[in-house]
From Swiss-Prot:
Organism: Arabidopsis thaliana (Mouse-ear cress)
PANTHER family associated with the record: BNAA05G37150D PROTEIN-RELATED (PTHR31111), F-BOX DOMAIN-CONTAINING PROTEIN (PTHR31111:SF54)
Coiled coil: none
Gene3D superfamilies: 1.20.1280.50
Lineage of source species: Eukaryota, Viridiplantae, Streptophyta, Embryophyta, Tracheophyta
UniProt protein name: Putative F-box protein At4g09190
Family annotation (NCBIfam families): F_box_assoc_1
CDD domains given in the database record: F-box_AtFBW1-like (cd22157)
InterPro entries membership: F-box-assoc_dom_typ3, F-box-assoc_interact_dom, F-box-like_dom_sf, F-box_dom
């Protein structure tokens, strides 16, 4: 067991000093049980404490403790190279005056390409092929190391979490069809390149989801002229790939989600919401189809499907960045999220205040479609 030493000096006849040993495991246990704001302050105690707090293993342990708390919906507005993040509580009353928020500016005038939340970490991928991760403990972003240029250019990346070993890994698809990079966070953080054990990647759509230690992503795979749209699964623990037959011949999803602990391809159509749910029946991957009719509220106003909560509620945002009051006046003070429970045939609207009000007003007045670049991430673990 690693130990750190604290020197306690006292006066006696021989001016002796006594060394007291504090087990490192005990320090980790104590600090990880503190509130996030207190943990950040402990970074200044010593270099050792700072190194402990910023490790992925420590982050994983803190996030795991937070799993019992209610998740939130992460809203990300994009204004040029600036990102505005807002954490919206899922189980909230009709109005929520304030939400936790923060901002981030993408370096080199880049644009947001992909964003996902996996076990508390936020993964960002930009148009300049740079990958960032936000540490929920330190509240700061850090850049992932670049791949060696001789291995090829990154096409896209996916963040995953292995709950068995408590490890975060990034899977990077390279433009060279027979190469894939793997980065284990905290393990010297250097890329490993795989060149076998999987089919050639001809195209990756960007749809992806990490569920129970497995990353699922969509693309065109095959050898030579034989290419087909399919879903690739990557087991983060064994680092093995498996090809799963696609339920349809073309990409059908509005979004991907974890539905009752299983991968679901969710589509919003005029008649309602359709789900293709992956069922592991004796390891023979099968798809189950479910359809939920549209709720009556959709007759009055247009809403856009953005995801599914842990409890199976559908998450919608309005096509408009403002609210009309009873007199028909435009109000920018509130942003609305609609939750629809298809099993109970019920719905609720939560109105949030303080969400980029000035930016929404200015951009809307000049015709800038702020809602077009809105990213919504369900089931984010807020620490």
């Amino acid at each position: 067991m690693r130990k750190i030493q604290r020197i306690t000096q006292f006066s006696d006849d021989n001016n002796r000093s006594q060394r007291e040993h504090i087990p490192l495991d005990l320090i980790v246990e104590i600090v990880s049980s503190l509130p996030a704001k207190s943990i950040v302050r402990f970074r200044s105690v010593s270099k050792l404490w700072s190194s402990i707090i910023t490790t992925p293993d420590f982050t994983s342990s803190v996030v795991t403790r937070s799993l019992s708390s209610r998740p939130c919906v992460l809203l990300i507005f994009q204004k040029h190279d600036k990102l505005f993040f807002f954490a919206s509580p899922v189980h909230q009353k009709k109005t929520c005056p304030n939400v936790e928020n923060f901002q981030y500016t993408i370096p080199n005038n880049g644009k947001l390409q992909r964003c996902e939340s996996v076990h508390g970490l936020i993964y960002l991928e930009t148009s300049t092929n740079v990958m960032f991760i936000r540490n929920p403990i330190t509240k700061s972003f850090f850049t992932l190391p670049k791949l060696d240029s001789k291995e090829g250019r990154p096409l896209t990346g996916f963040l995953g979490y292995d709950p068995i070993n408590g490890k975060y890994k990034v899977l990077c698809i390279l433009k060279e069809r027979n190469k894939i990079g793997i980065l284990t966070l905290g393990a010297q953080e250097s890329w490993r390149i795989l060149s076998k054990g999987f089919l050639s990647h001809y195209k990756v759509t960007g749809y992806a989801k990490c569920i129970d230690g497995v990353i699922y992503y969509e693309g065109s795979f095959g050898d030579g002229l034989r290419q087909e749209l399919a879903i690739m699964s990557f087991d983060l623990r064994s680092e093995k790939f498996s090809l799963i037959k696609h339920p349809k011949k073309s990409s059908i999803a509005t979004c991907w989600s974890s539905y009752e602990g299983r991968l679901a391809l969710v589509s919003s159509i005029a008649s309602g919401v359709s789900l293709w749910i992956l069922e592991d029946a004796d390891n023979h991957k099968q798809w189950i189809y479910k359809h939920f009719p549209s709720h009556r509220e959709f007759i009055k106003e247009r809403w856009k499907l953005k995801g599914v909560t842990r409890t199976g509620e559908f998450i919608y945002t309005s096509y408009r960045a403002y609210v009309l009051n009873v007199e028909g006046r435009v109000l920018y003070q509130w942003f609305r999220i609609l939750y629809v429970d298809p099993k109970r045939n019920s719905m609720r609207v939560v109105m949030h205040g303080g969400i980029a009000v000035d930016d929404i007003r200015r951009l809307d007045e000049v015709g800038y479609d702020l809602m077009k670049d809105l990213t919504v991430i369900p089931n984010h673990i807020q620490i």
